[in-house]
Amino acid sequence: KRLFARMAEVFAGFLSYTDAQIGRILDFLEESGELDNTIIVVISDNGASGEGGPNGSVNETKFFNGYIDTAEEGLKFLDRLGGPQTYNHYPIGWAMAFNTPYKLFKRYASHEGGIADTAIISWPDGISAHGEVRDNYVNVCDITPTVYDLLDITPPATVRGIAQKPLDGVSFKVALENPTAPTGKETQFYTMLGTRGIWHKGWFANTVHAATPAGWSHFDADRWELFHIEADRSQCHDLAAEYPDKLEELKALRDEVKALKRQTATGQAGALAGGAVDGIVVARVDGLD
């Protein structure tokens, strides 16, 4: 208990230090008179990490080499945690707690604990709404289109004669001014190390595939869950048995996008089966099978 509490305390210190550095940037912008004229976006890349293992670690690189630290090892470094002699990481239990009320943690693209993050956006001169909360579903791939939209910039089709790939994502500029305005985003896919998630119009289908050979089986054997995540953000009520058609609808979206990407990769231009799917985001679909 003493070790685990100290590991969380060190992480809290890191967060406080990071917050102070962001404060230095804001102070400079304020002193230079540019704070109100600067678009600021603050996000993190995933939920809290479980890479400390069950006992935490004094050196996170051990985890990536398959070595699980013991509590006894951690206690030897208790007074050095957070210093230059350690690269410590809190235990996996803290990851679960830090992500409350969401399930699981970083690496799980199938659950909100792995993919849900807070986002803070500020631009006093360009956004009339101040200090308000938005509940619109957005993804990190929507940030760049939104910034372009705020600045009335159209991304170039070519750069120095080289054709550019179209941006993934959908601008949510309208939601910054009007919380009830639709952004046009309808679908988002997630995948990481066998875990997969499909968000579509307030519903979320997910499954977990074992990341290591010990638990491998055919992908067709994976058990899918279904949540009405717009009303059940904690993914507590699996509705797969109650709404099997809805589950298959979401899985079909993924299959259609995979087919389209294969056509694109082989130079075969073609529409999605059954016609185009509006508002779909193809980001991070590679490697789903």
Per-region residue spans from a language model:
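Extracytoplasmic/secreted proteins, especially bacterial periplasmic and envelope-associated proteins
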Residues: 6, 10-13, 17-24, 97, ...
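Glycine- and acidic
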Residues: 2-11, 127-132, 235-236
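Beta-strand elements within well-structured catalytic alpha/beta cores of enzymes
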Residues: 15-18, 22-25, 29, 38-47, ...
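C-terminal cap/loop subdomain of S1 sulfatases and analogous C-terminal strand-loop tails that border
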Residues: 84-113, 126-136, 140-225, 229, ...
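Histidine-centered active-site microenvironments of extracellular/periplasmic hydrolases
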Residues: 28-123
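Long, internal low-complexity/basic segments
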Residues: 1-4, 53, 143, 148, ...
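Loop/turn elements at helix/coil->beta-strand transitions in domains of secreted/extracellular proteins
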Residues: 34-40, 183-185, 200-203, 246
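Anion-binding catalytic surfaces of enzymes that hydrolyze or transfer phosphate/sulfate esters
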Residues: 1-18, 29-37
